[in-house]
Amino acid sequence: MRTGRVTPGLAAGLLLLLLRSFGLVEPSESSGNDPFTIVHENTGKCIQPLSDWVVAQDCSGTNNMLWKWVSQHRLFHLESQKCLGLDITKATDNLRMFSCDSTVMLWWKCEHHSLYTAAQYRLALKDGYAVANTNTSDVWKKGGSEENLCAQPYHEIYTRDGNSYGRPCEFPFLIGETWYHDCIHDEDHSGPWCATTLSYEYDQKWGICLLPESGCEGNWEKNEQIGSCYQFNNQEILSWKEAYVSCQNQGADLLSIHSAAELAYITGKEDIARLVWLGLNQLYSARGWEWSDFRPLKFLNWDPGTPVAPVIGGSSCARMDTESGLWQSVSCESQQPYVCKKPLNNTLELPDVWTYTDTHCHVGWLPNNGFCYLLANESSSWDAAHLKCKAFGADLISMHSLADVEVVVTKLHNGDVKKEIWTGLKNTNSPALFQWSDGTEVTLTYWNENEPSVPFNKTPNCVSYLGKLGQWKVQSCEKKLRYVCKKKGEITKDAESDKLCPPDEGWKRHGETCYKIYEKEAPFGTNCNLTITSRFEQEFLNYMMKNYDKSLRKYFWTGLRDPDSRGEYSWAVAQGVKQAVTFSNWNFLEPASPGGCVAMSTGKTLGKWEVKNCRSFRALSICKKVSEPQEPEEAAPKPDDPCPEGWHTFPSSLSCYKVFHIERIVRKRNWEEAERFCQALGAHLPSFSRREEIKDFVHLLKDQFSGQRWLWIGLNKRSPDLQGSWQWSDRTPVSAVMMEPEFQQDFDIRDCAAIKVLDVPWRRVWHLYEDKDYAYWKPFACDAKLEWVCQIPKGSTPQMPDWYNPERTGIHGPPVIIEGSEYWFVADPHLNYEEAVLYCASNHSFLATITSFTGLKAIKNKLANISGEEQKWWVKTSENPIDRYFLGSRRRLWHHFPMTFGDECLHMSAKTWLVDLSKRADCNAKLPFICERYNVSSLEKYSPDPAAKVQCTEKWIPFQNKCFLKVNSGPVTFSQASGICHSYGGTLPSVLSRGEQDFIISLLPEMEASLWIGLRWTAYERINRWTDNRELTYSNFHPLLVGRRLSIPTNFFDDESHFHCALILNLKKSPLTGTWNFTSCSERHSLSLCQKYSETEDGQPWENTSKTVKYLNNLYKIISKPLTWHGALKECMKEKMRLVSITDPYQQAFLAVQATLRNSSFWIGLSSQDDELNFGWSDGKRLQFSNWAGSNEQLDDCVILDTDGFWKTADCDDNQPGAICYYPGNETEEEVRALDTAKCPSPVQSTPWIPFQNSCYNFMITNNRHKTVTPEEVQSTCEKLHSKAHSLSIRNEEENTFVVEQLLYFNYIASWVMLGITYENNSLMWFDKTALSYTHWRTGRPTVKNGKFLAGLSTDGFWDIQSFNVIEETLHFYQHSISACKIEMVDYEDKHNGTLPQFIPYKDGVYSVIQKKVTWYEALNACSQSGGELASVHNPNGKLFLEDIVNRDGFPLWVGLSSHDGSESSFEWSDGRAFDYVPWQSLQSPGDCVVLYPKGIWRREKCLSVKDGAICYKPTKDKKLIFHVKSSKCPVAKRDGPQWVQYGGHCYASDQVLHSFSEAKQVCQELDHSATVVTIADENENKFVSRLMRENYNITMRVWLGLSQHSLDQSWSWLDGLDVTFVKWENKTKDGDGKCSILIASNETWRKVHCSRGYARAVCKIPLSPDYTGIAILFAVLCLLGLISLAIWFLLQRSHIRWTGFSSVRYEHGTNEDEVMLPSFHD
């Protein structure tokens, strides 16, 4: 569309220039995916992470300050590989760096220059730290620019090949421990690739990145003859816009086809996909079909069945069937493969088509730039017109650029072509190829809406133009129209040819206007104020700017500004005139902010408008002089013009509006459908020029319905020509800030806008940002299904298509729609209660009843708007009140709506409604009132069309009086699913009989696990009708739901969640496939089936019964003649088939349908050979599925499929009406497992027994399961089924997995299978008295002390145990469990003879198991208290012995192995024995202590983690007692503290605890202030300390030494200051880098270690104290002698005994008298 006359080569090159004018097309360096710094405007600092906090530092370009936008609006920091996030669960310190897969809030969006996330937290800077605050105005910018952080949004990078079907990259993605934020290269992939999900290692989803490439290498195929390169994305399935963006991101475009040769090349590709997108679209409002690369649309190959002139619901994108080469219009949101295309030759110089050239023509001809034009006054056919032009030496007009179109529209027709005019464009080919009659090349096409519409296989086709834009239309060449002739004129060489413009240099003429560029950059308005009024004028200005600025990026001021900073832009006064805004040409994401002035850009976005700062920004100017008076503007509608009936307005509006909401329409629609709906009425979706209009518009709408609504408006950017800018669908220019910056994200795909309308008054309680939430719009994907509003100018009359049902407003104005009912508010006359009831009845309605919170809220709001706050209005009491929650206050909820007054009268007002509805009123009071009609009148005539009801057409499948349609919508809510079915002219399925149930089941294969059916009700009402209004006469709810206490969560503010809706379950092989579940209607489930009714009943699913019919993998044939069972066998053999075996619910349902429709029973291949004890299939298949009738009074040996679909026994010699034969195809059932050796019983009326290995299983749902069923009752039931059956036991992991598989067939409605575990003799065992040799408890060893518990196997394979302590939990367990019985066909051999013995002798020790949850240290202590040790292993036999203990116990157990420096080489046994045997092959798990798991798995765990027990052993031989000397010269031991022992001149003490080095020093100081960590002076002391540790061993042989290395001189020294005169380093650490040291007591060597790592024993050392004991004894003896002497003297004085003195006695102090013997143990 952008060229004049160019050659084919130049036309091909034109593509690149046009693409380069797109902001979306540039290579990745300008795509917005590049890293940047984040600058705080006030401080100029940049933020960066520091230990997961975010701090502000001086800016630099280093990696530690670089950030990047990545997928899902996350900010990724390059160096830390983390994302900026907010943990809203924390009140403070909530902003941090998180892993990019964290569940905290990681998304960020921009609002002007601020950055915000969830709950309106904004990024702020406080005291040098980045914080999140709800009250901040901090401004953030990209480093090196004035742009906000979202100025260049993140662009998706799409993929090909791989296994992601073209989905875009997910950045960052995780591989190993590295997060990648860009595509990566490696040898395993053919090009740069990325993951398409967050974790590549988990999902393994990937694709080759589609990045810009120069030339046609790599993914591209070159065709030099055509001059283009092609990229065939055959496995990549995208929507049209996604495919378009994928091509654009590579500097290419979607496929366009311009000749039969190119069509043949594309369709001739052998490996091309069957259907591929074309770039053909009509996404630009008010324009026709065009190529997305803007090449002329002159070649066409439409499919004959494609409506290129869409009616309501039409499509605006095109695809090609590559087998036929035909083009089809399809929904732009459908998913197709695609082909990208780009030109080979990228060089192009466009011809000058805009320079004014003075031209001379004959009288009556219009001169313009070298050509002469003549508009004929007469009408002729195209051929006659062509001949007449030839007679003038001219030809019919050809147009090659917008400059030519402008001449036609503005000069020939004065701005409006009111009647069609012939052009010289004509097609005589099939496929169509349009050519100019003058032989010039077609370089421009300018099609009108829905054009070119070429009749199939009918030529010739000719082209006319019409309308204000002069757009083109295909017409019959015989039609008589006026025409324009064109010929070359005489170019005048006169220098005064531009005399219309001022004589100054630089003025350029365009039409009757002159323009000049002022080359000095200046602020806004310095030179002049340029106005731009049309697309033609914009194109001319682009030409001027491009010629002026061919290399630099300059800006040129326009006169557009927002003087009041309201976000509303208008032209400044120019030449004394202020013009209205009639045209806009914004760049993408513009207008970005209010209060600015608008400049035009150059370069790759030539001519696009951008908002700039009026004062600080400097740009060039273009001044404009108009030589002739401006034409008066067309008469606009007046505010007081009337609106049509049923349309609404507000005083300041020039438009009328009509709302199409879900209560009044058949279905919600996507944006295109809604716009075409409005166009069919002569209207458009709404447009706005001022923000005040929006508020008034929302105020107008919010009283017309209840609840929150999203409504389509006309704002969109669907067309590639818009280059990412917004436009209104009615061509109203965009003159205001229409989209908040926060909603400009995802601009590549979200191309249509909707406005939110909701009620305000009730929201103040819980909404903090009411003004923002009150009414705003945001972009949606255009395929979203929403309600909409149509807009028509005031004074206009809407069109009335046949399908439209115009609204009758009524005498009291338009109704308000609330929850599916119409309400009229009758303000006059005032009547009493009974009169009001009669008045409503006379108008086919009722006095309004309030039954819900939503209804109350909506009515209250309406009353507040139309009457005084205290004005009372009559309402009616509810006859069947619905129990609903609603908000009574901020503190409490009212659980019962108080509408239960019977015949009493009620009124309410907007202010006192709560009091009003709680008391009776005076029934005779005269009041206004509210009438209600329950069935809303639809604005669309939706009742199934009689013609459509005759038969089921196209993809609809007939059954009886219904048609069923398979659809695949993905997960949707119930209301969305219902709307989708409405869009097909149907409803969700209603299941009215067993026959319909079977038919639906037969359609279920390949569908999702759960799908909606048309049943909806509340928890407080009885289910009695389907959504198609049919009575509920049949139900098939899953038996597990019977009697179950139901708990479906509801969202208080989501009305839909208060309703329950039904699902049909697709459980694959399960016999319960087809049963119904129910859930909240707001949940999302699959929609797979819709239905509609047909007047003709289809009674035969296949017409000819002699014909074989395929269903799934089998061929079936019905023999319709009387047969015995054996006769049926022979008949099937004659057909080389078998009597049918039914092995799954789908086959059963399919065949049951045949029996139902024919009302005939049929023999099937099931019979008994042992007098009805067991039944089997005649072809030897396993009986794994059954459908026995509930009662079968008489048992016989053969089986029929009866007319009700159930199996019943019959006498084999009876004649039945027929039989079903089949030929099995590829078997769908799994092959019988090799280990399934058991032959299971198969009695009548029993669920089939399922074989696995040597056992048979029966999974049951008991009839009274909602009542308590004890394990004993389950055991009794099993014994009744079979004498050898018992309740379920599980012997190994394979059996556990098998049972889980069976449980999952219940689709999580059942959560457990009950296990047959009982409690006897203080231990758990199976009901058959065998031991639990295999267990899989969820929480480890259960703590059970009695038999009051239930055990069950869960859907995740773990075993759960539930005690009877909590009644609710026990009942929940009962109601969500199924029972299972088991027959072990081979007697189970209990290898261990029951439970594990308490003591187990082995070699020189006795072993026992601590059977309780303990840490490693607790286990060590428990073993020690019983006089033993944790077990150790020293040879393979010992390893097998311990592993056997663990296997028999069934739980992971601690052993005595630990490491205290974190390395495997330092493992030690806690009993002090040598680590001389390694019992594992590898031990990679973290942790310092070792657990032995069942199956012989040795694993490292954290020593403080809790395990299910430990293995202890106690040696049979006692340890040898060793004594050490305790000296009085050593300190006295503190209470419970270690004893001091003497060696040489020092005392030594050690506790039984492990310490770090710093702790060891502290411990010694606490024992005695002069004690230090042990120092060693010689070999003897070294041996003493080592022996002391071995004899008092505990956990480890590592002992801290008080020897450390100085950092300065690297010398070693003892902590007590002594010189280092003796060392004994082990060889392997002699040159180690540790600065501390330990003694290894086992080999008496020293090792260098790091001071801060590991743990060891602490030995403290202190010098001997002086010996004061002898002195004390002597002093005590002397005192005693003194006392004795005094006593003797006293006695002598009393008895006068004579003193003779003491005998001579000598006392000698014993050398060892102060020594005691302390016991110790020796190995």
UniProtKB/Swiss-Prot annotation:
Pfam families referenced in this protein's UniProt entry, alphabetically: CysR_MRC2_N, fn2, Lectin_C
Membrane-crossing segments per the record: 1668-1692
GO biological process: endocytosis
Membrane topology of this protein: Single-pass type I membrane protein
A Gene Ontology cellular-component term: external side of plasma membrane
Cytoplasmic side stretches: 1693-1723
Key word rRNA-binding present: no
Protein name (database record): Lymphocyte antigen 75
Lineage of the organism: Eukaryota, Metazoa, Chordata, Craniata, Vertebrata
